[in-house]
Amino acid sequence: MTDRILIARIGAPHGVKGEVRLFAFGEDPLALKRYPLTDESGARRFKVQSLRAAKDHFVARLEGIADRNAAEALTNTDLFVPRDALPAAEDEDTFYHADLMGLRVEDQSGALLGTVLAMHDFGAGDVLEYTPEGGGRTLLLPFTKAAVPVVDVPGGRIVVVPDTNPDETPPEDADQA
């Protein structure tokens, strides 16, 4: 497991006074004001001075960022927080996405299907992306209890029901062609 968790990404500047668009990845975006944030290398530290909601993101003022040029230089900077600064998972069905990366993907019989590559949220719920064991293009599954009935982080695996994969499900009218 990683000792730092990706918690937000800085977007483009907002206005001319150094504010930035901020895309938060946690359940409580306002908690970003409490966390010790760093860039990916851990060398640069950030403190959120103010945070307000916008359409599909937040607008943040970061300590030491006073103008648009300074804000622009931070565009696409990922913000990380130390794992020990985050709350523990509340139940067995709560995970940090970082803990799922690299887990073995198995079917219900235990056959290896691939490896977890990424988690995505396109607006309709989390989607799991995995690399197939035999190579080829990555596959996507909805990250639901029906499609992913077992998540065993300590055991290094997840169990999936492959026929819930939209990429492998034929269209409803496929047999009418």
Swiss-Prot record:
NCBIfam families, per the entry: 16S_RimM
Domain of life assignment: Bacteria
Cell compartment(s), UniProt: Cytoplasm
Organism from which the protein derives: Azorhizobium caulinodans (strain ATCC 43989 / DSM 5975 / JCM 20966 / LMG 6465 / NBRC 14845 / NCIMB 13405 / ORS 571)
Any one GO cellular component localisation term in the record: cytoplasm
Family stated for the protein in its record: Belongs to the RimM family.
GO MF annotation, one: ribosome binding
Domain notes: The PRC barrel domain binds ribosomal protein uS19.
Protein name as catalogued: Ribosome maturation factor RimM
Entry-linked HAMAP family: Ribosome_mat_RimM
Role of this protein: An accessory protein needed during the final step in the assembly of 30S ribosomal subunit, possibly for assembly of the head region. Essential for efficient processing of 16S rRNA. May be needed both before and after RbfA during the maturation of 16S rRNA. It has affinity for free ribosomal 30S subunits but not for 70S ribosomes.
GO biological process: ribosomal small subunit biogenesis; rRNA processing
Regions crossing the membrane: none
InterPro entries: PRC_barrel-like_sf (IPR011033), PRC_RimM (IPR056792), RimM (IPR011961), RimM_N (IPR002676), RimM_N_sf (IPR036976), Transl_B-barrel_sf (IPR009000)
Keyword Translocase in annotation: no
